[in-house]
Amino acid sequence: MQQTLSYSSSSPSPSPMPMPSASAAQTPPPNPNLTPNLNIRPSTNPIPRPRSTGGESAFQPAIIPVDYSYRTHTTRSILSAQSMAPSTFASNQSFVRQPSESDAQPYSSLFGDPVPPPLQPDDYFGTAAFETLRNGSVELPSSEEDALVAAMALNALIPAARERIFPSVPYSRTPRGSLLPYLQPPDIQILPNSSGGSSSEQLGSPNYRLLAPDDILNKPDVYDLENEVEEYTVVGQRMSFDDEEDEPTRTPSQAPAKLSVSSITTEDHRGLLSDSYSGRDWFRPAPQHFPEFTRIPRLRPSSKMIMSMKQDEGPLSPLATMIQDMNSSSSGGEERVAPNQSRPVSRDVVLSPKQYLEEQLGLERGSQRQSLEDYRMPPPPADPPPFRRTDLTEQDDSRSVEPEHSLKREMSPVIIRDSIPMGGDYRVEQPRPHKKTAFTILSTGQAASSAPRPPQQAPTRGRHASIQSTSTTTSSPAGRPQISPRRRSIFGSEPRLPELPSALGYTSHLVHQTTDDSPRPSVQFNMSGRHSRSKLAIPQKGILQQRDSLTSSIDTFTPRAQIRRGSIGRDPIRSLPYGQKIKSMETLPLINDQHRSSIPRLHYGSTMDLSRPEPAVFPPGALPRPLKPNLNPTRRQRGLLKIINKEESLTHNPPRSNWCSLDDLSRPSFDGTPNQARRRSSSTSPERRSSTQTVSDRRSSNLSSVTATTSDFSFRRPTLSTLPAAQTLSRMRRKSVQALSPNRIPNRIPSFGQRRQSIYQRDQEPKPLSRHGKIAKPSTLSPIIGTPNKDSSSAQSPNHRSSLMADAVDTPSEVSTRRDSVSRIPVRKSPDSRSSSPPKDFGIPASGRSSRASITRSPSRTMNAGSRSPSRSMHPSRTSSRESGRPGDSRSASRGPPSRPGSRLDQIGSRMDRPNSRLERSSSRAERSSSRADRPSSRFDVSNSRGNSRANSRLSINSSSLRSSSISPATMARNRSMRATTPSRRKSISLSPASAMMGRRKSISPDAVGQNRRVSSRGKPEPPEILSRRNSRSRIPTRSTKVASKSPPSSSKKRSKSPEKPKAMGSTPKSNKVGKGVTAKGSPKAKPKIAASAKPKTKTESLMKPPVKNANKTPVNGRPTTNAKKPASKAISTKDAKVEKGKETGKSVASKSNGKETESSVKSSKSQVTKTKPPGGTTSEAKKPATTKTHGITLEKGTNGTDPVGGIPPLAAQVGNAVLQAVEAVPAVTSEVTVPSTPGGKGAGGANMSKLVRMSSRMSLLSNKSTKVRSDSPQNRKVATVQEHATEKEETVGASSQPMSNDAAAILEKSQKTLENIQKTVTEATDEIHKTISENLTDLKSLENDLAADPSPTPSSGTTMARPGESASRTGTADGSIAPQSSGELPKSPFPPTQPIEASVSVLHPNESSAERIASVPEVECESSDLPTALDASESELVGNVMPTPESGADFKVDAKRRSPDGQGGSTAGSGGLAKSSSQEFLEDKDNVKKGGLCGCCSKLFMPCRRSRCSRCCRRRERNESAEDQPVLWSGNSSATTATNVQVIDETKPKRKKISDWLKSSCCRSCRKKPAIEEHEAHQEEVSKRTNQAANMSTGPRTRGKCGLCLSKVFCCRSVNRVDPTTGDETEMKQCCFCIPCRRGSRPNKKGSTVSWRDQDPELGIKPTESSVVEGASEAAMSAATDAGNDQVKEGCCKRFWLMLLCCRKRKRRESNARRQSIRAPPPSEDTRKKLHVDLVEYSSKMKGAIPVLPLYLAWFCAFCNVVFPGLGTLLSGLFCLCVGIPRFSQFDSARARIGSFIINIIVAVSQFFCVLFCFVGWGWSIWWGTIMLRCAKKLSKIKKVERLELEEEQRQAQLAEAGKNGVAEADKT
């Protein structure tokens, strides 16, 4: 406020002071008289003044233009005779300042009366922020802004005034021209002062008060009528300053005095003002008094006190005055402002902040009448304000008379006195409580002025554009300063402003000075608010200034001012010549109501408009505000955050939008619709724009918490807005949500149904609330609290919520940003009443609205399209899941960041699935409350998948913004649409555990977002595109759980899934995956097999009884949302549910219903599973369909044309029963089984079941491992699936399961037999594996816990997670995000951690139907065509889903890998350790092969397309022993850790390999010749290594396939462990299609020593044995490297080159293995990669580093070539480097380094050759290069020699030691 005052006083002083200097003694006494005379003069003096101000003309424009812009325009029309006189003009300038000060009040009256009666503005100002602001004083912020706007508008309206605004600069003749600019800068300074100190209040009030703070406020009559009227009439812009300066001067001699002032000219004024009040001083030229103003900001604490610079104080420097006034009661000054405002709103300041205040008071006094006259364009303001204005002028004149000793000085002091009253009174209701509102207090006073403002408002509006435009012009502000600055000039007690004569030269200079002064004082006072362009751009005291900028945007939104402008000056503004400045004013007036931004902008605009009288006057704060105008408004902004929001609207339609926004804030009834629209549409942009520009400044300016708040809002809102920016709907929604946020406390529940309405309602509420809340000013703590705190407290606390809620309502961007959390919370809370605690979601907000609340709630809403109660119910779930408090279900809700897609999905699934988890409970409640299984299911699916992927992956702001968008009701609708899409995405995720994890990770988060939006839609279908995209990802996890639950949502999901899934699974459920189904026998199971890949429904059939509805989501997932979606759902369910999961769904669900390894009967388990699947929120629905799933799904699938249900249910029954029986903990098996069907669809319940399934899978694998669990493992890693539990499951399945039952019975018998055989093998393997597991389980658990994934107690959980259906857990494991799900699983099936058997079991004789079925089930691709039985079909379906999952999961190369490492060992809690078992090792190989039927390459290539099958290699593999591969994979996936990897290898069907004969034909002989035994041995070695070294286990498979990457998969190179069912012997069978990619000799075994890719790969040119390469390598390592090198040599450079080109490097595989092993504590492994000796490494230059280390002979050759032919040797060295040489970039060789070296050498060689043309430089260069090569080669040879010697020495020592040991031993023996 002090700033504002100082600016005001400084601004007025220049023009008043200069003019009065001649008549300083004369004018002051007459000032009081002149004030009455001014009332009379309006007709007499005004004309003479301009005319007689010939000499003063130069003077006048400087002063009058700014102030006169406001008053002179109107006054000109009214007092054309008066103001026309040059002397009168001079007097007017003096008086203009004073009346300007009082003008603010009259002006408020002026605007208030003419346009919308002052009551509206009063309501507006008093209502929200301005009630607080106007408590003590005339509240310049509203009036001031309105005055600025109105002045601009009136100036525009009044042609004469306009002429004076622009002609007014010339009006002053030569002196005035200069004076005008000069006065304008002071005025601007004053305005910035107001804006800086008290943007809204003190802006206007200081403008007027600064002119004559004491005089105008205390003696309004002196300055008001005569001076201001004359001023406006005669002076024009200059009149503003003249009013302040000359009004005292006029008091002694009105016309003569003014003439004298005019005669005084700029120089005279300077002389008069030169004292302490010289115009410049008053202006506070940056060089001179800027320091003082800088000090003034130091006085900022007192700035809340009105710096009433009394006339005596006036002579003091602005700083001294400010200090004095600060210390003195600013309230008194403000009170003066009120009287001054009551006095005529001197047309000097032409409705500048001062005039604005004067106008406001003008309603109370004659000054206001004159102010109205000034704004006579709008009739209402014209007459009343002039009289009141006259009164104000008289009072001001009286005050001015007091300082008459130095007219300029007196005027400035008077102005100072009147203007400075920014303190106490204004501070009453300052909007930024955190700060001592020196200027905010003015805003408080503005409440009163807000009443008169309606007339001003229209003019302000009118001027709004002009103000902005004017503000934009920095030069014009010079003329403007007189507008509102003149009174605020008080701060510049020294009549710097009065130094008008210098304004001629100083006009622009002063503008800058003002700007400079303003910035610093503005920090402290509103001075910054009036800061000039530079101030705006670079607030020097950044806090207030920056804040002003924020507030400027906010202030711009002053709806009330805007209204007035619209009524009065809007048209004039547009017609104003200073249209550019109107823009600034546009911003300013909009804000003027609430944030006193109008004044700050006016001040700045005045500075800007000094060249243009009116533009300067009107936009003093306008342009500054656009840039960084209202620091003080920023302060108010705290209280008036919604102004900030409205500021956004202002951007589009600044005056109206601003007014509307503020109006909405203050008065709900005002322009409600525009408020909403603008707020939403532009709430973010203007505020952000302004705040963004001033963000650093605002932040840097820590003056007020508003700054922090504003900047935080700016940043946050922009951040959130940016996130939602991409999503306009989201942004709108966010705004709606924001509305909810404000409404949250008052309207939250009411607005639950209507976000957007709620916003508007809230807006309306906050308006009254603002009145009540008094702008919810942040307390002094606000700065400490910070913007967010203030914002949130404002939003939530009653008062703060009133104003800030309105603010938030108005500022969606700010709310979206900073309040996004709050808004989101309200959204959740409101829509989802369950999650009613905002704090709970507050941590989530960034991701919150859309992440937790929105996702969980949204899914609930989506599911409960009709019932929001479930949504709310879901909300707690969502919240819980976000918090990830629940191990299993909480994951979905918690959306733990660790593994976004999988882990989140799994977490969601597990949390939602786990009834104990709050998420599940809340979900269950949501389900129950909604009692719509479909909706809860869909919601859960969306919530789980989306919550997991999105909450976890998008806990960040981005994710939250996306979610946030999704959260709004519209988003909820969108989420529903998304549901349709999710199934396919879910399918994709469901593919293979590893690939599913990858896919989820990749796609779930987007899908999650989509689902979030869809959930946000709350049943309102949002754009299906977004939904399908987002939903598909997140949906997969959720769907499994909620397939049955969400029949209708599933329909949507099915639709979307159907399209998406077909990509991975093939659009046609049955025939899409023909390749996969090719092997399928004609039997129904064969069909399901086809469906397995192309027909998710088959899987759904067997796995998901409910999915029957949802053919797609047959799996326990709520996927089968609708039978209508069956077709799409089939493919989707296959993917998502994955037949495995479908089969296991019942069990999994059962176990899920238990929530843990429930050991309830299969039936109860099944029904519970059905219930449990939906537990997230689909529980009630899921329960119904769950049972239906078992029965109806299978049947439905048969109906759908998927495999006959009979085939699948037996599989499901077998799997379920076998798993249940095999695993003592049926729930665990069930969980495992369910997970597969949950893979994509069962995000919530499925994820939980995943945990259970994994645990049960491990347990069941322990017991059922030898049972055809592995065969069944394709069914979902439920290795023991085929066990007795199958019978139970059949029972549970009931009728629908019976078709499968028959098969299941046979399969069960066979499987039991096989199980016995397998169990033997498994027992052995289990013992071994248990050891490994025991060793690694602890590490795995600890790692999983560390990974934030709740590791299931047993690796089986990991296996379950690894399932495609369990993509969530799988994903979580790989990413570490699965860990939460694992954790959830841990509680579910905790006891099989060590139980899980990782033994890779391949059934060699799948002749038995059970074995066949098992094999076929693993082979989703129909590789197990041997098992065309129902079980086979069901398994095929299951695997088909799995296969599609790998297809979709094909992207997830990690899918298989994760299955085995993540899914098996890594993914599951104990999976890491278990993964190390031979089974896991096998799985790794299989993973690479992609059991899903997609090779890793195909997965990568086609996963995005969701291609159901992989290319030739995959098809071949399908025909080949995919059953072997996939069963293992599935075992690894479903129960990799727990269950033995069981492969049913039909030895009678070894011809499958023959299918790949064509590929094999291309294999190299060595590869073809390689006996499987050798490979098996190598594999066994690797297996043993893995078993012993859990960390190295994943590496083992890599070594086996050196490429271990795309090539091995592309060419289907994979090794399968064949297990003889009778003997249990395991044989590694290598299926190699292409020798080069495979390269799988026994070398992998040697990998230990030659770990580096180049050691193993022929790519590395140098053999690992080279001592130079193998630095520090052990002898064994060296020998191993040598062996590997020999192998490499055999392969040859060409092969290496191709391998390199094919990117078939182990490094990738190592990375994947690292991911797998990431779960386990990685054992400290030495880097066995070959190292180049440090001495040979070239670190300094890449170019030199490209010179390879070559063998000495090659180096000599290259050097010779370089000498003979420059560059040739370099080129050859590059070529040699590819095969032989070693690049010296680093110690470690790599293909990239070699290629890089080759490229660099080519470049260098060419350069060397061509450089020979230039002075033979290239020759020397070439020779130098050859020398370096020789040197390196020699060094290498030396190193090799030394190493050889060392090696020999070591060997000798070892021999000696051995001999010594032997001798000792012999001695001991003897």
Curated annotation (Swiss-Prot):
Pfam families: Spec3. It is found in: Cell projection, Dendrite; Membrane. The keyword Hydrolase does not apply. Residues 1-63, 90-117, 238-266, 323-410, 444-535, 606-709, 724-1208, 1261-1301, 1336-1480, 1643-1663 are annotated as: Disordered. Residues 1-12, 867-879, 890-904, 943-968, 1080-1095, 1161-1173 have a biased composition (Low complexity). InterPro entries: SPEC3/Stum. GO terms for cellular component: dendrite; membrane; sensory dendrite. Residues 90-108, 250-265, 651-660, 789-802, 848-866, 978-993, 1034-1044, 1111-1124, 1187-1202, 1368-1384 have a biased composition (Polar residues). Keywords: Cell projection, Membrane, Transmembrane, Transmembrane helix. Disruption phenotype: Impaired walking characterized by walking uncoordination and reduced climbing speed. Type I neurons are apparently unaffected. Abolition of responses to stretching: although the dendritic stretching is not significantly affected, the Ca(2+) responses to both acute and obtuse joint angles are abolished in the mutant. Axons and cell bodies are indistinguishable from controls, while the sensory dendrite exhibit abnormalities: in some of the stum-expressing neurons the tip of the dendrite is overgrown and extended into the distal segment of the joint. Residues 1463-1473 have a biased composition (Gly residues). Residues 386-410, 686-700, 880-889, 911-938, 1133-1146, 1450-1461 have a biased composition (Basic and acidic residues). Expressed in limited populations of proprioceptive neurons that sense a mechanical property of specific joints. In the legs, localizes to 3 labeled neurons: one at the femur-tibia joint, the second at the tibia-tarsus joint, and the third spanning the second tarsal segment. Dendrites of stum-expressing neurons in legs are stretched by both flexion and extension of corresponding joints. It is a multi-pass membrane protein. Required for locomotion and mechanical sensing in proprioceptive neurons by transducing dendrite stretching into cellular responses. Required for transduction of mechanical stimuli in a specific subpopulation of proprioceptive neurons that sense joint angles. Probably does not constitute the mechanically activated channel and may rather serve as an accessory module required for the proper localization or function of the transduction channels. Was named stumble because of the walking impairment phenotype. This is Protein stum. The lineage of its organism: Eukaryota, Metazoa, Ecdysozoa, Arthropoda, Hexapoda.
